[in-house]
Design a protein with these regions (language model features):
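Start-of-domain marker
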Residues: 24-120
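Short, well-ordered beta-strand elements
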Residues: 120-132, 208-214, 308-317
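C-terminal motif of bacterial Sec signal peptides marking the signal peptidase cleavage site
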Residues: 15-19
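Surface-exposed amphipathic alpha-helical segments
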Residues: 134-158, 186, 307-344
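Short conserved aromatic/hydrophobic patches within beta-strands of well-structured domains
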Residues: 177-194, 333-339
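Secretory pathway targeting signatures of secreted, lumenal, and periplasmic proteins
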Residues: 25-27, 41-45, 183-247
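Signature of long, low-cysteine stretches enriched in small and polar/charged residues
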Residues: 80-132, 239-306
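Bacterial N-terminal signal peptides that target proteins for export
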Residues: 1-8
């Protein structure tokens, strides 16, 4: 835990570190950061990149995203040499600079934010030897991913605060008495006394979420089976493309060992977000009586004010393209939720 905290809070002047600092000569106003979401520019010279260090670094950054229909990495890696970086790409949104030198006393990862562009995170990973840096990655790889994920999440939330879907936020506030920050592009689709559905439609994809509440009746209400049952009841309100079709939760998946199917339940864990416990479910959805489907992630918490369970359920449909960059911003929605009556 101390290692995670160190990476999260350590901010140092890169000019004080060993080696050339390509930022020192750059002055002036901040530029808009370049690069795509979930893309990391790794500044690493050839010897280190071709060594076990480069192999381990790629393995960490390209860790598969859990519970997607196909394999997608946590981050796409773009590698560049220090020389090319200095002249071409110092304003990238996510930068990881690699420095291996015997002059470095201790292996560490340190962070700076908005160095020459905004929003930007610049991580410097340094150590005295390749072996020491590889071992550090084995121990702290998940923390490195966490820091980069938090940077992406904060960008989503800040953008929603500035460019929000205010009309939709108002509908949700009136229905559930919660505050949310929702980016422009999401449009209201349907509502009832205990349900709101919104989506962002693209020519080749759909990015949507629905919020619903239902009575809390003790521990039996929050078993995985009960949560999936509740999900299916509300998902029926999301129509499919043909008459009588509707969304539901996948219950069986192909067996990789033969041509049959096996029973499947969404993955479950409890996460604490802004001091509140949420039950996270990750699984797959499909359309009853039609051929559509994709990944979903839902977050359920107890709204003590009403004695009800509140769920934010996020789904993606993207049959031709990757799903990571559609699903991640939906996951970020829950980090912008607040319960005003509980905060008084």
């Amino acid at each position: 835990m101390k290692r995670v905290a160190y990476i999260l809070v350590s901010i140092v002047l890169l000019a004080a570190m060993v080696g050339c600092d390509s930022f020192r000569s750059l002055t002036g106003a901040k530029k808009t950061a370049q690069g795509s979401p979930y893309e990391v520019l790794v500044v690493c010279d050839g010897y280190e990149w071709e060594s076990q260090l480069g192999t381990e670094l790629k393995a960490v950054l390209e860790t598969p995203v859990e519970m997607l229909n196909q394999v997608e990495p946590m981050f796409n890696v773009v590698r560049i040499t220090a020389r090319d970086f200095k002249h071409l790409l110092p304003s990238y949104r996510n930068i990881l600079k690699v420095l291996c030198s015997p002059q470095v006393a201790e292996t560490s990862i340190v962070a700076q934010y908005d160095v020459v562009a905004s929003p930007q995170i610049v991580l410097t990973f340094q150590g005295p030897s390749i072996a020491a840096m590889v071992e550090y990655l084995k121990q702290n790889g998940s923390a490195l991913l966490q820091v980069l994920e938090i940077a992406e999440r904060n960008r989503t939330i800040e953008y929603a605060k500035k460019q929000g879907a205010r009309a939709l936020e108002k509908i949700i506030k009136e229905e559930f008495d919660i505050d949310m920050h929702i980016s422009n592009g999401y449009l209201f689709r349907a509502e009832s006394d205990d349900f709101v559905w919104a989506s962002n439609e693209y020519p080749v994809a759909s990015q949507g979420f629905f919020i619903y509440s239902h009575p809390f009746k003790g521990k039996a209400s929050v078993t995985t089976e009960s949560l999936v049952k509740a999900r299916n009841e509300f998902a029926k309100r999301i129509p499919g493309p043909t008459d009588g079709s509707y969304m539901t939760t996948v219950k069986r998946i192909p067996n990789v060992e033969d041509d049959g199917y096996v029973d499947f339940m969404p993955q479950r864990k409890v996460v604490k977000i802004n001091g509140r416990d949420w039950i996270e479910l990750r699984g797959f959805w499909e359309v009853e009586r039609d051929f559509m489907g994709g990944p979903f992630v839902s977050y359920t918490t107890l709204d003590e004010r009403e004695g009800e369970l509140l769920t934010i359920d996020c789904y993606v449909y993207s049959p031709k393209y990757g799903k990571r960059n559609f699903l991640r911003p939906l996951e970020h929605l829950v980090y912008g939720v607040s319960f005003p009556a509980n905060d008084k």
